[in-house]
Amino acid sequence: MIKNSITNKLYVEAKKIIPGGVNSPARSFYFVKEIPVIAKRSKGPYIFDVDNNKYIDYICSWGASILGHNNYYITSKIIEYSKKGLNFGLLTEIEIKIARLISKYIPSIEMIRMVNSGTEATMSAIRLARSYTKKNKIIKFDGCYHGHADFLLANSNLDPYDLFSSNPISSGIPKNILKDTLICPYNDYESIEKIFDLYPNKIACIIVEPIAGNMGCVLPEKNFLYKLRMLCNKFNSLLIMDEIITGFRISLGGAQSYYNIYPDITCLGKIIGGGLPIGAFGGKKRIMNHVSPSGSVYQAGTFSGNPISMISGYACLKLLKSPDLYNKLNKKTEYLVNELRSSACDNKIPVVINSLGSMFSIFFTNLDKIKCYKDVSSCNYKKFILFFNEIKKLGILFSPSLFESNFITLMHKKKDLEKTIDSANKVFKILKNKV
């Protein structure tokens, strides 16, 4: 039985001093109409809340945790380095070490600039692309999230007479800021071709999640990424891959290595910080040399490349080269996903479960396939909400939004997966009778 007395009290206090009671909206669990989990500590695959409830965690810090929570090696390196100083506002050797390591693992990154968040990474990457190409228009995909910079916080305008234009998904964003942001459905190559036909000399870049992780887990159709690469080559536009979620999650070389399609600029975050705040963008030297102080594209930050995030990330990335690590992660995910599919089928609950590597999402739908934001938006919200809340009562913590992926870490053991499968089976039986 889940207890909530301390959680309820603290959440009331949080809402008095923090907008909505949280410092990032998804943490509020508003989508599932539930009070949030207020974490107290974590270890391995587990989260413990302030009421001492224990959860098997599949949020995994929104994908940032791949080795499990509170990894001893990483935390020991953080503690050891912090005795030298927390931040210097100067270049440190550890920045050079992690930059070299990332470049070694991801060959398309010949130079890299460290920042503090994914938003800073994508914002800076697009500024760089616009400067390098001397073009202004950018293409993003409906439902793909690339941070909260004004010109990226947009989805499609549904007006059939205003194709490819964008609507802000936040108040406070003037419409004219989005005049150069063009939106297409994910996996719809024909729409991209039409945009290039309309603006053949004006597209600075395409920014894409190689695997969409912010409308659940949605995979690219066969040759979709290849076609984007070829189109950018043809029109002298840059291809930016937002690998903030997929970088070091899908493979040691990211999704680009898995699909063998390489971008001009890559955005990274989450895993490369080893659990601490970080972001980065990198690419070919001929492009990256345009970044200040080498070039005219300005980017700066007091905490960019701060040594504590750098040592944390470096320690994490060193561990990821362990032989068979990704194979183990993938096998765990395949086992869990196959059993969840089987259980849903046995209970006559129509679902699509998308997965790749250690990412997965459960969609309650009668569709055969989920391949874009429109498909995700058509899914059965009521079933998702009921599933989330009922399985949470059993100590399983999935992502609290239909539009966020779930993740598995190296520390999820067979017993954790089996408990998750057994709990899901119980909840599918409830869904069968209730919805």
UniProtKB/Swiss-Prot annotation:
Assigned EC number: 5.4.3.8
Main location: cytoplasm
Transmembrane segments annotated in the record for this chain: none
GO CC annotations on file: cytoplasm
Cofactor(s) listed in the protein's UniProt record: pyridoxal 5'-phosphate
Subcellular location: Cytoplasm
Protein name: Glutamate-1-semialdehyde 2,1-aminomutase
Protein family (similarity comment): Belongs to the class-III pyridoxal-phosphate-dependent aminotransferase family. HemL subfamily.
GO MF terms held by the record: glutamate-1-semialdehyde 2,1-aminomutase activity; pyridoxal phosphate binding; transaminase activity
InterPro entries: 4pyrrol_synth_GluAld_NH2Trfase, Aminotrans_3, Aminotrans_3_PPA_site, PyrdxlP-dep_Trfase, PyrdxlP-dep_Trfase_major, PyrdxlP-dep_Trfase_small
Catalytic activity: (S)-4-amino-5-oxopentanoate = 5-aminolevulinate
Keywords assigned: Cytoplasm, Isomerase, Porphyrin biosynthesis, Pyridoxal phosphate
PROSITE patterns from the UniProt entry: AA_TRANSFER_CLASS_3
Pathways per UniProt: Porphyrin-containing compound metabolism; protoporphyrin-IX biosynthesis; 5-aminolevulinate from L-glutamyl-tRNA(Glu): step 2/2
Complexes and interactors: Homodimer.
Name of the top EC class for this enzyme: isomerase
Single Gene Ontology BP annotation: protoporphyrinogen IX biosynthetic process
Keyword Isomerase belongs to the record: yes
Modification sites for N6-(pyridoxal phosphate)lysine: K270
